[in-house]
Amino acid sequence: MPASKPLLIALLGPTASGKTCLALQLAEQLKLSVLNVDSRQLYIGMDVGTAKPTKEQQRRVQHHLIDLRRPDQPITLQEFQAAAQLILAQKLREQNMPFLVGGSGLYLKALTCGLRPPAVPPQPELRKQLGELGQRTCHHLLQAADPTAASRIAPADAMRTKRALEVVYATGKPITTQQGSSPPPWRVLELGLDPHNLRERIGQRTTQLYANGLIEETEHLSQCYDSDLPLLQTIGYGEALKVIQGLLNREQAIALTTRRTQQFAKRQRTWFRRQHHPYWLKGEEPLSEALSLIQAGLR
């Protein structure tokens, strides 16, 4: 790969691994901005449940692709990729590339590997019909139509399930047969975080999310939008919604959120090890190791 290509740094890892903290430290040291690659942080008002960087943190370091749309306006992978590539192209001209931070594997791959998602626009009427069928039925439909996609998408992930079905019904072909790739105009250095005490960190963060007002945020979102909104069924929000509906108490919700998050982190680990090849940062103080790897990559 030509050394003349600019270096794009990606910081990846499972949820609660410490990406936000390290990203802020790296951004301040290197005087770079951050490009968000967390699919839920794209949405306005979903702050507590996604552990979105605080307003103070966003003032310290410029963040791109946060708060793009309302939660009832889904963003496809293709739309995310187009928005991200516009920012990257501008920063490339300025010779000040941001670095990618997030745990949404497919979104990362779209930027680091030049993944080309199918150009199928959202179809609100179809999504409404699929929503009426229920997520369990939708995932069964996907298993029949595109078994490969179904094996990669969690049974509870309504947004990605509907998107995969949308592509199948619009084109007559599985989404997994239509995702090509083309080399991006940059070199990529992937740094991975996967601390040994991740389970403990997940438990602590989940408790903190509820202390920070996850139930209150969910109640506000459910009043502003339909409580059947797919994003309100995702980890954390789904359990908080059940507290509001009287189906769970707070302690049960925390326990269930913790368990679902641990299961999600396991899937993230599997994805990153199969689809990416990061330098896994070791030790309790990854900043110095990350800086050394970045400086070596810039040479």
Swiss-Prot record:
Binding residue positions for ATP: G13, P14, T15, A16, S17, G18, K19, T20
Catalytic activity, as annotated: adenosine(37) in tRNA + dimethylallyl diphosphate = N(6)-dimethylallyladenosine(37) in tRNA + diphosphate
Any one GO BP annotation for this protein: tRNA modification
Disulfide bonds: none
UniProt-recorded Gene Ontology molecular function terms: ATP binding; tRNA dimethylallyltransferase activity
Swiss-Prot/TrEMBL cofactor(s): Mg(2+)
Region (Interaction with substrate tRNA): 38-41
Keywords: ATP-binding, Magnesium, Nucleotide-binding, Transferase, tRNA processing
Pfam families xrefs: IPPT
Source organism, top-level taxon: Bacteria
Role of this protein: Catalyzes the transfer of a dimethylallyl group onto the adenine at position 37 in tRNAs that read codons beginning with uridine, leading to the formation of N6-(dimethylallyl)adenosine (i(6)A).
Subunit and interaction comment: Monomer.
Stored PANTHER family: TRNA DIMETHYLALLYLTRANSFERASE
Family, per entry: Belongs to the IPP transferase family.
Protein name: tRNA dimethylallyltransferase
Native species: Prochlorococcus marinus (strain MIT 9303)
Name of the encoding gene: miaA
